[in-house]
């Protein structure tokens, strides 16, 4: 197994910097609906289908996204 470790979010709301770390680490995670102060983080599966998305300010946003990052996230090489 490689030394790649999943990049996860805090269990609650997350910052733009935290979202950028995740989008940099994964090929299939994107920021959408960027309103400046708030935005959605979106995860697609390997086939490109939407798996999950959350606004960055949701109280349990990271808790909702982290299982999908761990199971569906495609780490960049």
Curated annotation (Swiss-Prot):
Q: Which family does it belong to?
A: Belongs to the UPF0401 family.
Its protein name is: UPF0401 protein c5157
């Amino acid at each position: 197994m490689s030394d790649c470790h999943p990049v996860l979010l805090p269990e609650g709301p997350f910052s733009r910097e935290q979202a950028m770390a995740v989008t940099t680490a994964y090929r299939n995670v994107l920021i959408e609906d960027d309103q400046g102060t708030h935005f959605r983080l979106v995860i697609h599966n390997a086939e490109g289908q939407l798996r999950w998305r959350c606004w960055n300010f949701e109280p349990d946003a990271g808790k909702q996204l982290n299982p999908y990052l761990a199971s569906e996230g495609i780490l960049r090489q």
